[in-house]
């Protein structure tokens, strides 16, 4: 039973997560020839202040990009 853990910076809508889950599940089902009900997808929302790119938080990068 495949378990897919997707980590994203928080802020994505439930609708967007549902679409990602649908597509990931379909791809794994097709490639591994498994029923879709055997595939688990979990989302982890990470606060922008806890996600670092290099040594800078995503929160700071977003603020910088808005200037």
Per-region residue spans from a language model:
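A domain-level signal for the structural core that forms small-molecule/cofactor-binding pockets
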Residues: 2-67
